[in-house]
Design a protein with these regions (language model features):
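Conserved short alpha-helix immediately C-terminal to the canonical SAM/SAH-binding motif I
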Residues: 38-42, 80, 107
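A short hydrophobic/small-residue beta-strand
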Residues: 29, 98-99
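Active-site capping/gating segments
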Residues: 104-138
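Conserved SAM/SAH cofactor-binding pocket of Class I
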Residues: 1-61, 65
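Short conserved AdoMet
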Residues: 66, 93, 116
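A short glycine-rich, Lys/Arg-flanked "PGG" loop and its adjoining helix->strand segment in the class I
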Residues: 85-97
Length: 138
């Protein structure tokens, strides 16, 4: 994958840490979105402080991010993921990759039907009680 042409979208960007990691890995076009104004401001500050150029959007994924991305990152808990997974599918390129994390053991069985409905699991990693998935569209 040529990272120069990849758009990476971080959903629920928070502090923007995943954008900083993506930039460190060589991804040039970075977008973070968060519904919380404070989080969006912090992400912008952290990107600026680390000399990372990123578009930060305070808003709703469905209406405020108009493009698609080849890589989408979402470190979110189960409740927002259950709502957002169908929207994320519309924002991910057909051959793109979605990486979700923030899924704790206690809620694993609850999220799996949402994942299995529209997504193919490429890889699952477990660290203690936490699960991370790399997914692609079915």
């Amino acid at each position: 994958m040529n990272l120069d042409s990849v758009t990476c979208l971080d959903i629920g960007t928070g502090t923007g840490i995943l954008l900083l990691v993506a930039a460190h890995l060589g991804i040039k076009h970075l977008v973070g979105i968060d519904i919380e104004e404070y989080a969006a401001k912090q992400a912008k500050i952290n990107c600026d402080n680390n000399h990372v150029v990123a578009d930060i959007i305070c808003g709703n994924l469905d209406t405020d991010f108009k493009d698609t991305a080849q890589l989408i990152l979402a470190n979110l808990t189960v409740d927002p993921l259950k709502i957002l997974l169908p929207q994320i599918g519309k924002k991910l390129d057909d051959k793109g990759i979605l990486i979700i994390s923030g899924i704790i053991d206690d809620r694993y069985d609850e999220i799996m039907p949402y994942i299995n409905k529209e997504w193919q699991i490429i890889e699952e990693r477990i660290a203690g009680p936490w699960h991370t998935f790399a997914l692609e569209k079915r």
